[in-house]
Amino acid sequence: MFSTRNFNRSKPVLFILILFPSLLWAYQFVTGNLGVNPIEKLMDELGLMALRLIIITLMITTLSNIKPLKSIVVLRRMIGLFAFYYVCLHFSTYIVLDHFLDMKFIIQDIIKRPFITFGFISFLFLIPLASTSTNKMIKRLGFKLWKKIHYLIYPVAILASMHFYVLVRADKTEPVIYMGIIILLLLHRIFKRLTRPQLAQ
């Protein structure tokens, strides 16, 4: 039921489902249907989508340890790249639509405002993950080095959730939930790594 073949078959549908929100928000933005502050709304939606996809990517890694769901890992790369896609749109909206490429102001903003600092560092950490996501790069780097590079997904997720937490001024329930999920997934990863030698014995 949960074979690699079935998960691969679901990719086209999943691709459309994940891509669709960005097209919808772009249409709503162009037609003036994103509320009274469309640029802020667009940034918020794109950023939140990116964070959710990052968390889903981490969850796939954990779920793939469950034998019947092992093949779900074939979806991880596509979802991870979509997370990068949404982060790029989020950041582009910030620098182009919100600040009109005023790089001096943007650099000062990144330095002075902690939540933007967290978000920017998270974005920088995502770049090597996206750029080494192909099979060709895995072969070139070697699996061990590639795997070490892709551990960056955890600081990416933590920084992204901190970005969201500091940004939210009122009800922080949602960012706290996301941070909690990320911490649990990270603890599971650490526990698995620490107990692996014992299991091998």
Give short role names for the model-derived ranges.
Residues M1-Q201:
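Membrane-embedded alpha-helical bundles that constitute the cytochrome b-like, heme-associated redox core
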